[in-house]
């Protein structure tokens, strides 16, 4: 009887501790979080690694990312609107916060891929993503720094920071 109880305990322990090792590695690769959890943490990182339904966060997003003012800077773009349209013309939008982060909770919008996206700023400046989003609503899954043959770099509003809305002419 003791052997049976021990066997059941070991099997259940193993089953409960098993998870998706690829997902666990992706979470571990993010490194330590240097800010408190919340809407301003982990700017520039692939949000859906933790918020994509597999955890460790219980808050699930369908889309999330970080916006920057210009292609060549890491200055956060606060107050921009991210507008998404999915394959069935479903729409959702979100505003970027003080570190440039935005997110759309999965409970309010679950897209049918592919999706299209554009960002706009209150002064009328707009950036439309030329390609579609095929399957992953985490911007940083494709838009990683630094820019390379495998990534266009982070998401930005203007190419040159000198032309950022509201900046005085140089």
Q: What is the predicted function of each stretch?
A:
Residues 56-58, 66-77, 166:
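Structural motif
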Residues 88-99:
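Short, acidic Ser/Thr/Gly-rich low-complexity loop/linker segments typical of extracellular
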């Amino acid at each position: 009887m003791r052997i049976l109880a021990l066997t059941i305990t070991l099997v259940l322990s193993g089953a409960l501790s098993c998870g998706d090792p690829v997902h666990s590695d992706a979470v571990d690769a993010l490194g330590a979080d240097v800010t408190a959890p919340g809407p301003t943490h982990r700017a520039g990182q692939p949000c859906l690694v933790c918020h994509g339904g597999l955890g460790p966060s219980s808050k699930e997003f369908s889309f999330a990312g970080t916006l920057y003012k210009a292609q060549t800077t890491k200055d956060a773009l606060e107050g921009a609107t991210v507008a998404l349209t999915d394959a069935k013309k479903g729409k959702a939008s979100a505003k970027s916060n003080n570190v440039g982060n935005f997110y759309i909770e999965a409970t309010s919008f679950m897209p049918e891929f592919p999706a299209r996206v554009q960002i706009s700023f209150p002064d009328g400046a707009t950036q439309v993503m030329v390609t579609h989003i095929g399957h992953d609503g985490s911007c940083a899954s494709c838009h990683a720094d630094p820019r390379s043959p495998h990534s266009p770099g982070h998401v930005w509003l203007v190419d040159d920071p000198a032309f950022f809305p509201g900046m005085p002419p140089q």
